[in-house]
UniProtKB/Swiss-Prot annotation:
IleRS has two distinct active sites: one for aminoacylation and one for editing. The misactivated valine is translocated from the active site to the editing site, which sterically excludes the correctly activated isoleucine. The single editing site contains two valyl binding pockets, one specific for each substrate (Val-AMP or Val-tRNA(Ile)). ATP binds at residue 596. It catalyses: tRNA(Ile) + L-isoleucine + ATP = L-isoleucyl-tRNA(Ile) + AMP + diphosphate. It is found in: Cytoplasm. Binds 1 zinc ion per subunit. Its EC number is 6.1.1.5. Its cofactor is Zn(2+). GO terms for molecular function: aminoacyl-tRNA deacylase activity; ATP binding; isoleucine-tRNA ligase activity; tRNA binding; zinc ion binding. PROSITE patterns: AA_TRNA_LIGASE_I. This is Isoleucine--tRNA ligase. A motif ('HIGH' region) lies at residues 57-67.
Amino acid sequence: MEYKDTLLMPKTDFPMRGNLPNKEPEWQAKWEEEKLYEKIQEKNAGRPTYILHDGPPYANGELHMGHALNKTIKDIIVRYKSMAGFSSPYVPGWDTHGLPIETAIAKKGVKRKEMSIAEFRKLCAEYAMKQVDGQRTGFKRLGINGDWENPYITLLPEYEAEQIKVFGEMAKKGYIYKGKKPVYWSPSSESALAEAEIEYQDKTSASIFVAFKVTDGKGVLDEGTNIVIWTTTPWTIPANMGITVNPDLDYVVIESAGEKYVVAEALLPSLREKLGFEDATVVKTVRGSELDRVVTKHPFYDRDSLVMNGEHATAEAGTGAVHTAPGHGEDDFLIGKKYDLEILAPLDDRGVFTEEAPGFEGVFYDTANKMVTEKLEEVGALLKMEFITHSYPHDWRTKKPVIFRATAQWFASIDAFRDDLLAAVKGVNWTPAWGETRLFNMVRDRGDWVISRQRAWGVPLPIFYAENGEAIITDETINHISELFREHGSNVWFERDVKDLLPAGFTHPGSPNGEFTKETDIMDVWFDSGSSHQAVLNARPELSRPADLYMEGSDQYRGWFNSSLTTAVAITGEAPYRNVLSHGFALDGEGRKMSKSLGNTLLPGKVIKQLGADIVRLWVASVDYQADVRVSDEILKQVSEVYRKIRNTMRFLLGNINDFNPTTNTVSYENLREVDKYMLIKLNDLVKNVKDSYEAFEFSTIYHQINNFCTVELSQFYMDFAKDVVYIEAADSHDRRAMQTVFYEAVVTLTKLLAPILPHTTEEVWNSLIGEGAESIHLQDLPDVKVLANSEEITAKWDAFMQIRDNVQKALEFARNEKLIGKSMLAKVTLYVDGEAKTLFDSLEGDFAQLFIVSDFELVEGLENAPESAFKSNQVAVQITVAEGETCERCRVVKKDVGVNPKHPTLCGRCADIVVKHYEA
């Protein structure tokens, strides 16, 4: 007889290597074929809903690690909720209008000006849908479970129709108006931009000090006195209409080299050196309020520049007197309106000067900086020029500088319902908590929202104009356009004449001849995605508004969180979300932003081909995603190592329950040994902790909890000593079935707990466990937290034992290093104990030699009896010696009774009994 044939070695079809890049697509094909998403919805029908509303990614370009981070977090949440008693449908979406798509079409050599807008828009739509298809394939390969056959896409007619309704409702409430005021203008995009489309970058600019000569001093200043201004935008001097001083600041008139100059008193010390005023004497001091309506002359145009009082003039920098061009700045505009100045903005859409700026016609504004400075020097008005580096607004798409430019635009008035917006922010639950402050401050401080864009690819502003110029936005026109868009798509606006867009027989007092025109601007793309609560949550039967959760990157406080809140509060009076969760950005291993120029980009598609989607997903679960996160080949290698440990744990558990039938072989809790109960209690604690962490969206905690459980409780303890039972004992012995009961419970529990994070691997485990015809793991519910008898008492005892076991392990390691023993199985452990430790061991049931994975064990009372050579700690002393006896050929334990059965001279008594009883014919 070959004794090795009497060992019950692990057997499983679950392979050691995951081979994820090849296996995952097979599972995905199976899920699609079996309509798993639909089955999950059917299973959860009638349960309370949990709606995570997908913020739409922009349909342009390859998926990056930020996409993978975002979509995986969402998928983990939705999968968790779907296994936790909720109906949690997930409808993915895409944002498909806007400049990047126009730019992409232009890069293909398409000449926009040589075709109709409608034709150009068709090309944009085709391109966007191709991008959607490419990204959809990428998201599905990542294992994201959702309604991929019916996503929401902002260019679809039914979406645009609902967006028009949102606009109409806001107009009806008086929140939409047309006005001329300075807005962020991007010459590179030839369009107005909203605050959300601005990012700040360092820029080097010319900083100039300019003298404006007084022509009417109002009895306060002498004629010919110079008021000194400072600006970092010399190109705006041609648009200067005034100078602003603070009414509550003191200003000094100084005399230097026969000329008089006015500056803020507080700034004089710094200006003496900068402007060469070292020897200047102070002639008089005046309050800013006394300078109100003093008249100066523009340095090189024949027009006045009025001195005005304004709070925004400060003594923090410059001269305390602010150059004011009402067409090129918000503060300038507001004070210009107050003083009835002309709102002059002499630039065209491309940032080129018009004839309203004589001497600079046809010159790009940035190029004009040098020309303006030279002109000021020529007329003797330039006191100083230097270069400074400062933070300056840029177009977040083109990365080029933007300017403030007064143009006629359509706005959504925020002032009209700002208090409601702020109250709504307070009513939402924010994670991280600082999100509330961030959005609250943004809403509190933001100006009105410029919603018009001078572009082609977007949803048209549904506005008509009467013959007298009056804008027409009525229930009748809005409903008609909404239905036209629903039937034909928004391109109909550009394909049809005005008369064919208006309701039949439409009349308006402003058009006695029945003539009308239509608006040519489109809506800000943030209005598109910001209307999704109406076009998706409110429109789809399986969804509802408000959503339970909006979850996006932290850049969306100024973006989607903000625009969605604005439109929702405007039309419904409440926020579109109950909870908002935000994540940071994916950076490289050194914490740098990923970019092609740095060559540090890591694409999820490439990682999935090499390692598999479950590794990307496990990386997402491993990071503290609420801050910026790092990813690199090295980091993914570490994650892969944790995956390997989890997989090996599953394989060991599966392999050792191959002959276990849970229906007939399960040992009831009360009949388990205490150490088995201890493991089930630990497993139950894991269930509670993991479910709490899922609920709090703390996935990195789950990653560590499960990794620790697999490594510490299972691999290093229970599974390790279990081999002496499950391999060695008779198949149906009580102790073996008890341990298999724990193994079975552990593999079922771990598989369910990990299913939201590792959907492919857990499906593979589940199929191996249940066998042919197994219903998907993703149709199961998470395990319940159980009430287990005496759990506190058992935990306290065995936790204390585990601490002592750690000391024994250290002593064994020391003995191995000192060559006192070879393998631990050759050792005898003598444990010297006092007090509490003695009481503990008296109360424990178990084969301690087996638990310590040694051949012999002796407990001795009295620490004082321990020899000098013993390994000592605070409670115990451990003496390691070589076990007496011979090694049993079957169980490899050193026993004194080897050969007790003469028929089996190389076996210990235990093994001989098992062989005689179960394997001898």
